[in-house]
């Protein structure tokens, strides 16, 4: 069975819901290391790292947004300056290039709301903040769409050179996404329960 890096966020759920692959969970920055070190054969890697490391991309699946993304937002804090969770590379670079913002790295986004004027949060923690009504200054996908007008790619599918069974693994994930579109309710329910957020937000 092909070992596939699954980025540890809710948006990965449809890709792996019904896929017969060995999922290796990892954070954004860890994913590239697992592939480079041979601990996985295929996986999703932030597009910034894939480009920086010259990793071979499989142009079949990607994690991207067209317009507002909800799970990548600059939330309004009560302090000064701008902070970003350490896991983000793509969103921080996008806001740096488009809005001229630079960020201090933080580990705890909730604590950072007290210290920083704006906190860039991505993934599941961003969804929790939206669910709890934390106001935001900017939605990364929305800013990108308004300023650039193209889809914003967060993560691309990368293969380890020489790995076997990749075509079958990619097909498994494509079929899993197709199952999700046919019947999204079980995935929506599972994600809402796991994150402790409203079903309506997950549906968005």
Predicted feature residues:
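Short linear motifs at secondary-structure transitions and domain/linker junctions
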Residues: 33-37, 47-53, 64, 68, ...
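Pocket-lining segment of extracytoplasmic ligand-binding domains
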Residues: 107-190
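Bilobed "Venus flytrap"/periplasmic-binding protein-like clamshell domains
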Residues: 1-19, 25-26, 65, 69-117, ...
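Hydrophobic/proline-rich hinge and linker segments of small-molecule sensing/allosteric domains
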Residues: 57-78, 147-161
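Active-site regions of enzymes building and remodeling cell-envelope glycoconjugates
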Residues: 20-25, 55-62, 82, 100-104, ...
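Helix N-cap and loop-to-helix transition residues
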Residues: 27, 46, 89, 139, ...
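N-terminal hydrophobic or amphipathic helices and topogenic motifs
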Residues: 1-54, 58-61, 78, 178-204
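Conserved residues at the C-terminal ends of beta-strands
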Residues: 45-46, 85, 122, 160
């Amino acid at each position: 069975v092909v070992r596939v890096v699954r980025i540890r966020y809710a948006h990965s759920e449809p890709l792996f819901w019904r896929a017969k692959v060995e999922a290796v969970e990892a954070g954004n920055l860890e994913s590239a290391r697992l592939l480079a070190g041979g601990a996985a054969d295929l996986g999703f890697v932030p597009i910034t790292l894939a480009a920086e490391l010259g990793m071979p991309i499989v142009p079949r699946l990607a994690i991207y947004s067209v317009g507002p993304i909800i799970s990548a937002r600059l939330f309004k804090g009560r302090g000064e300056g701008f902070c970003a969770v350490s896991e983000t590379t793509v969103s921080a670079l996008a806001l740096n290039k488009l809005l001229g913002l630079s960020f201090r790295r933080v580990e705890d986004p909730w604590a950072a709301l007290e210290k920083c004027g704006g906190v860039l949060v991505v993934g599941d923690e961003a969804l929790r903040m939206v669910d709890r009504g934390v106001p935001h200054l900017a939605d990364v996908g929305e800013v990108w769409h308004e300023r650039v007008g193209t889809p914003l790619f967060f993560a691309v599918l990368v293969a380890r050179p020489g790995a076997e069974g990749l075509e079958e693994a990619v097909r498994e994930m494509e079929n899993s996404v197709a199952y999700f579109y046919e019947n999204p309710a079980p995935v929506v329910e599972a994600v809402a329960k796991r994150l402790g957020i409203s079903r309506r937000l997950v549906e968005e």
